[in-house]
Amino acid sequence: MEELIWEQYTVTLQKDSKRGFGIAVSGGRDNPHFENGETSIVISDVLPGGPADGLLQENDRVVMVNGTPMEDVLHSFAVQQLRKSGKIAAIVVKRPRKVQLAPPQGSLPVDEDDRAFEVMDEFDGRSARSGYSERSRRSSHGGRSRSWEDSPERGRPHERAWSQERERSRGRSLERGLDHDDDYRRPRERSRGRSLERGLDHDDDYGRPGERSHGMSTDRGYDRGYDRGYDRGYDRTYSPEAEYGRRTQPDARHAGSRSRSREHLRSRSPSPELRGRPDHAGQPDSDRPIGVLLMKSKANEEYGLRLGSQIFIKQMTRTALATKDGNLHEGDIILKINGTVTENMSLTDARKLIEKSRGKLQLVVLRDSKQTLINIPSLNDSDSEIEDISEIESNRSFSPEERRQQYSDYDYHSSNEKLKERPNSREDMQNRWSRMGATPTPFKSMGDIASVVGTENSKEPRYQEEPPAPQPKAAPRTFLRPSPEDEAIYGPNTKMVRFKKGDSVGLRLAGGNDVGIFVAGIQEGTSAEQEGLQEGDQILKVNTQDFRGLVREDAVLYLLEIPKGEMVTILAQSRADVYRDILACGRGDSFFIRSHFECEKETPQSLAFSRGEVFRVVDTLYDGKLGHWLAVRIGNELEKGLIPNKSRAEQMASVQNAQRDNAGDRADFWRMRGQRSGMKKNLRKSREDLTAAVSVSTKFPAYERVLLREAGFKRPVVLFGPIADIALEKLANELPDLFQTAKTEPKDAGSEKSSGVVRLNTVRQIIEQDKHALLDVTPKAVDLLNYTQWFPIVIFFNPDSRQGVKTMRQRLNPTSNKSSRKLYDQANKLKKTCAHLFTATINLNSANDSWFGSLKDTIQHQQGEAVWVSEGKMEGMDDDPEDRMSYLTAMGADYLSCDSRLISDFEDTDGEGGAYTDNELDEPAEEPLVSSITRSSEPVQHEESIRKPSPEPRAQMRRAASRDQLRDSSPPPAFKPEPPKAKTQNREESFDISRSHDYKSNPSAVAGNEVSGASTRSCPPPIAAKPSFGRSILKPSTPVPSPESEEVGEGSEEQEGAPKSVLGKVKIFEKMDHKARLQRMQELQEAQNARIEIAQKHPDIYAVPIKTHKPDPGLSQHTSSRPPEPQKGPSRLYQDPRGSYGSDAEEEEYRQQLSEHSKRGYYSQPSRYRDTEL
């Protein structure tokens, strides 16, 4: 005889961008079924390859969508609920199924649809089905129904399936997808406070009469006169959706319970001992849990179990708000937390959800009047239970379609050294649980297989709780007493062991920074075992390293790095109960990081990410090996996978930074080339070449440890995009109470440049006024703001098109002279290179000005949101950040050694004179550039002339770098005589003018400071004292005058105003200078002769050479025949420091120099004269 039953499932679907949820629905109150008039919402089609493929089937009845019942609703209402579900929809469906009341002895073929479903990870939202099934004796959408599955937590005490293993999650999420291979022989899951959802096979679900399949006799199960106690009992398969679905069916309370224990899920040939046992369901209630044994006869058989979980209130504080409210009780099952369904939610996620409630916690609970969950008795562990755990594999997946490979544990000793198997393999099993990430680690040992074989041969049912195996008691041991300081820090119940490290420490570790580091296994015969360390001990300190809050990878590396033979001092504390809870819940590492480099996907299980993404690391020793972390991507969609560990990440980041630096060097070269060139085309070309290498360097490490916190101050605001300058001005003008523009200042105190940097002190002062600081800075400065913990709100205006930018700017700022093409290109480059800095993006629409309202709303929303802040100070930030980064680079300043015009969206004409704007045509290439505003990155026209590609002016630029000349903005007045006076000067005036400048007495100093590039002889002639008014115009016949000469002194011809050519002026001054030089040389010669005559007259006073001086014949042609004029003592201006020429050789050398200058003429080497800066 067949009877129709209904199995209920909860499915979580993720919407595909192209195919939606991949289902079609029909039915409804306004569209009943044409044959039987059924008004249920029915799945009419499932798209192959879609999100629902394999999860939903045709003719499934939709019971609930995201908590909204779908019973007796309109078709349009159901469609609307699916459409507004967003990206994720939790759908509860019921599926019809016919069963045989008296099944044949042979087992039916296993239906593919009844196989155990792949269980999603706690962060994977693809599939979460509740294994609720009910039996209906009426039509497909109503009637009295009976549950064919039961939860051990909510069942009657004697109906609960208590698996005898260490898996006591106590309210934790523990979902297990059980696969087909024989690694799933005897799964035992005891989850305190969790429902274990199970999908059962044909041959086991509705098994033989007398067999205790799932803790209930099938004869009694199909008998309509079943025990009335079950008729009044709970439906033990609980999930929020299933509970709501049962509320809509009045007779769903008639549920026959099934024990979830695996010990009564039998194979095709049931045990005669079990069939001969009296029906346990008919026995009175008992608090004693039952044991169930499942054994496979074939490798492809399934257990058919799906494990679920639910959160309940375990304890309430008497003085807390929950107790005072009076609506909550211990044992209540929490269905929703602030609107989020808690089915299969882990305690960690539930805690975070409560922490984010911000003072308002809304709960939806189900009252458990029997308080079944909190009355669960504690059970002791047995050896066989621990062995059975090794065969339970968690099919957690990184993505819905990928299965995680079986894990292996990491040995902390050498690779060729393995921990020995314990006789009872109990400790070995717990050792294998040392990999504590987000999921438990599956293990299999030979002891487990032997246990299975022995049990199968004995054919003894294990439905009773076996007494716990006696724990071996260690001999009394006296531990070292910790120091008083350690006792004060770590507590009094600590023990200290000290031993010498051998080949390895001999320890396996479990846990992580979230729960602590625990000893998960000890190698036999090692010093650690001999000194009394035990499994379950929490390691608090090793030598001088504090292990509290240490991630498991760092703990492993620290133990490995201890040299062999060195003393190891371990401070530990026995916490076996906490250790068992850690093994049960799978907790270990848990911290958040933000990436500051880019990583591509290496393996199918890896995650690809870019800069600025946030991850939660749940295991730093994935698969028991160093090199990868198991992490969950934090964002709109949660995704789990592998990322490089810290050391590998730093290597990858350093390579990327080096590549960026090399690209930056090329950019600097092209920038300087563009600045040296005065041609517009070359300048534009250099900009285009430069933009390809633009990238933002950072001071952050590869991984930055972050925490989610609320900003307690008004965060600065930085805007990027083609209308950012207009937006900044508009915010400052219209909302002065909320926004204030941070003024830019010159970087150097004495600089006269109009723009430069924004001081951090300025930003701080604006924040102290409770206002948002509006910053006009570069992307690199934004990175510095984040580094200094200011967390700016960075908003990017995304333009729709170049024409749209032009239209908006002409409407918002008609007087603007910026190029829309350039602004549009810069916005696209920013979006490619600096998108990780943006906290929000506003899409511009040139047809309206709604962007301003969006801008204000975005800033307000961003200010109220929590931000990812650095967990601690960055390295190098121990000092006051003002000492290291006291300013931010303004948009007008150079950015990354590049022309800021490549990045800046806040420029005016930028030296382009309208030729690069939307309002004027291009000017000729030779037209000088006109800048409307002077800024640090924009040279003015005068400075542009410096960069003309002429080799001689560049030489003058180098020589013009004399400290005296740069220090003094203008030369002394004596060096700027009026040209007419210079023409009529007599010899005495020329002499006075030449002597009026205060020269240093040392000729070498004169040559070093003022005759740059001249002769390097030790005693040059004092001809450098000639007037310099002719120097500024004595240059090659180039059309561009030397800027240095213009800065040092104005040319005489500019003051004269005479309409003479440059060549004529040069000839005039050449004649004048030549005449003055000859006169000066003659005066010096006469003075020297006078000194010699005086010395010869008074030999007792002056020491002079005896040899008579022979005058230079070349000099006589220039000397005058007039008698020497009497002069005063020689001026110190031209004297040697010794007072006179101390030797005849020096005097002779000096005269030869004068003669050589007379022969060559002063302008025989005009470049030497041009290089003289006076």
UniProtKB/Swiss-Prot annotation:
Chief subcellular location: other
Role according to the record: Plays a role in tight junctions and adherens junctions. Acts as a positive regulator of RANKL-induced osteoclast differentiation, potentially via mediating downstream transcriptional activity.
Interaction with SCRIB as annotated region, ranges: 1172-1174
Subunit structure: Homodimer. Interacts (via PDZ2 domain) with TJP1/ZO1 (via PDZ2 domain). Interacts with UBN1. Interacts with SCRIB. Interacts with OCLN. Interacts with SAFB in the nucleus. Interacts with USP53 (via the C-terminal region). Interacts with claudins, including CLDN1, CLDN2, CLDN3, CLDN5 and CLDN7. Interacts with CLDN18. Interacts (via N-terminus) with CTNNA1.
Assigned keywords, A-Z: Cell junction, Cell membrane, Membrane, Nucleus, Phosphoprotein, Repeat, SH3 domain, Tight junction
Modified residues (Phosphotyrosine): 558, 1102
Composition bias type Basic and acidic residues, residue spans: 125-137, 146-214, 220-235, 243-266, 274-288, 399-430, 940-951, 978-1000, 1150-1159
Pfam family, one: Guanylate_kin
Annotated region described as Disordered, given as residue ranges: 125-290, 391-430, 456-490, 904-1065, 1100-1174
Gene (UniProt): TJP2
Biased composition (Acidic residues): 1044-1056
Domain spans labelled Guanylate kinase-like: 679-860
GO biological process assignments: cell-cell adhesion; cell-cell junction organization; establishment of endothelial intestinal barrier; positive regulation of blood-brain barrier permeability; protein localization to cell-cell junction
Membrane topology: Peripheral membrane protein
Chain positions found as Phosphoserine: 107, 127, 130, 140, 145, 147, 151, 173, 195, 217, 239, 309, 382, 384, 390, 399, 408, 414-415, 483, 686, 886, 897, 904, 950, 962, 970, 990, 1052, 1131, 1143
Modified residues (Phosphothreonine): 439, 889, 909, 917
Processing after translation: Phosphorylated.
PANTHER family (alphabetical): TIGHT JUNCTION PROTEIN (PTHR13865), TIGHT JUNCTION PROTEIN ZO-2 (PTHR13865:SF26)
Organism: Canis lupus familiaris (Dog)
UniProt record similarity statement: Belongs to the MAGUK family.
Domain called SH3: residue spans: 588-653
One annotated GO molecular function: cell adhesion molecule binding
Subcellular location: Cell junction, Adherens junction; Cell membrane; Nucleus; Cell junction, Tight junction
Domain PDZ residue range list: 10-97, 291-369, 493-574
Record-linked InterPro entries: GK/Ca_channel_bsu (IPR008145), Guanylate_kin-like_dom (IPR008144), P-loop_NTPase (IPR027417), PDZ (IPR001478), PDZ_sf (IPR036034), SH3-like_dom_sf (IPR036028), SH3_domain (IPR001452), ZO (IPR005417)
Name of this protein: Tight junction protein 2
GO cellular component: adherens junction; bicellular tight junction; cell surface; nucleus; plasma membrane
